[in-house]
Amino acid sequence: MTTLFDVLSNGYKDKKKKSKQLGDYVLDESLSNHNHQTYYNPKDKKLLFNVTGTHNSHDWLTNIKLGLGIGYKESDRYKQSHKALRDAKQKYGINNATLTAHSQGGLTANYISSKGDNVVTLDKATTIGGKSRENSKDYRTNGDIVSLLASTRHNTINLSNPNKQTGNIIYDTLQAHDIKNIKNEKLFV
């Protein structure tokens, strides 16, 4: 089985360091880039689609749009991930996929998923009045500010923060948002 940590951390690696296989899932490089990764399990005929969180300067501009509630679905980031997921479903003849994501990628995964898809996120970016799909499971690290607005939603699972609080608010907040917080958790996708 593949863990959520393995999928998310592989998404942040640069192309040369990305694992080509996670458990029985094989990376489809033709439908992957630095913003999203497509994995197919030929044995079980399952599709896994990961949307990476903020990792470059363009993403920070997208974060501003997200925060203001304008133009997010018009962003290249959103459009590319949406198209890649649809193309992957068509290529593999799959209607229902599992989508994983972290931070900004979590909001994207929520938006691009279909009714039958399962969405599993960590510290998903959330907007005021934003909704989560019924088919999503949103893990949130206590102390994470990006996902704070989702902390009381029915599909949010609040995880304890494994980091020692230093009293430095900026440092502690960044630590709470790190995917390494779930490295030892048994969260399978």
Label each region the model flagged.
Residues 9-98, 118-120, 125, 130-134, ...:
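A conserved cap/lid and substrate-binding interface adjacent to the catalytic center
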Residues 36, 109-110:
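Generic recognition of flexible, low-complexity loop/linker segments
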Residues 43-46, 94, 113-189:
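Serine hydrolase/lipase
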Residues 100-105, 109:
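Gly/Ala-rich beta-loop-alpha elbow adjacent to hydrolase catalytic centers
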